[in-house]
Each structure stands twice: as C-alpha cells, then as structure tokens.
Amino acid sequence: MIITRTPFRMSFFGGGTDMPEFFNEHGGSVISTTFDKYCYVTARHLPRFFDYSTELVYSRIERVSDPSELEHPAVRNAMQMLDMREMRITYEADLPARSGLGTSSSFAVGMLNAFHCMKGTYASKDRLAREAIKLERELCAEAGGWQDQIAAAFGGLNRIDFAEGDFSVRPIVISPERKRELNSNLMMF
C-alpha cells in the first residue's frame, strides 16, 4: 500500500499571471507557499476476488470493471495516462474541495506520485508538476493556471516564474525566526 500526503497551497502575489493565455505573451510570476493542511491518497493493488477491478473512495464510492468507466475525470485520465489497473484508491483531506487552496491539484499530484510508486518508478517534483498540469488542464480540460500543481509538487515557499509555455521554481529561503513571525501574522478567511 502506498500513502501520499500532499500539501495545500496559498498564494501571496501574482495570481492570474500563471494562466498560459497571459504568461505566454507577457510572462508571469507568483509567490506561493504550502502549509500544514494536506490531502491523503492511498493506493494499493486490488486482488481479483471482487466483481470489479477498480475501487475509488472519495465523497462517493465507485466500483468499476475498467478504469475508463470511472466517473471521476482526474482519476480516470490519470489511470489511463499511466496505464494503471486493478487498484483501490482512497482520498481524504484536511480541507473541503473548492476551498480556493489548490485542493484538486494537490490531489492530482498525490495520486500521480502514488501511481508512480506503485509502478516502481521515481517521479521528480518537476515531473509530478508537469504531469499534473497535463492531467488537469489538457486531459480533463479544466480551466485554470499552473501554480497549484507546481506548488503542490514542490512544496515550501517559492517564487514561480512562467514564460513561453514553461516554468521555473526558485525557493525563497527565510530564517526560522522570520518564518515564525510570518506564520503568527497570517490569517486565512
């Protein structure tokens, strides 16, 4: 069994400049951080003792004979993209969906990470970010920018720059004292 824990993110500056329609023409940059709220994905092989081959547990339970029958678009497309079969996947989170903190992208990154582990392959932070962007923006055709997937994959406090269909991540290093000060003066609404 593989268990992943992927952080959620909040942005400080640059929201909207992570949209390809914007940054391909003008460039873009965001400052974001992950924080101590997470999504958890478990993935394991499902023995052939059941009358279904894939089980997905989130706010619903889906049991299907083939991953292409899954209603959840991100899971269906990720399983097809990485050729995953005969699995039980569960999703839990510290925060509700649609909170504005990148929950769907954290789920995508955590799920892809779990799938790579199940296959015995290493996926770098960069690879996870790029695959999550492809999954959500291309395969699932969800509107939005790129910062959520990148923040979830890289974690920490970062400046993320966007230009010409690509991105780069630069960690922002701050002292433990400054981090405590920042944490004690932030409020989320």
Where do the language-model regions lie?
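ATP-dependent small-molecule kinase catalytic core of the GHMP/sugar-kinase superfamily
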Residues: 2-7, 13, 18-28, 117-189
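Generic N-terminal targeting/processing segments that precede catalytic cores or assembly contacts
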Residues: 1-65
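Anion-binding (especially nucleotide phosphate/pyrophosphate-binding) glycine-rich loop
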Residues: 36-135
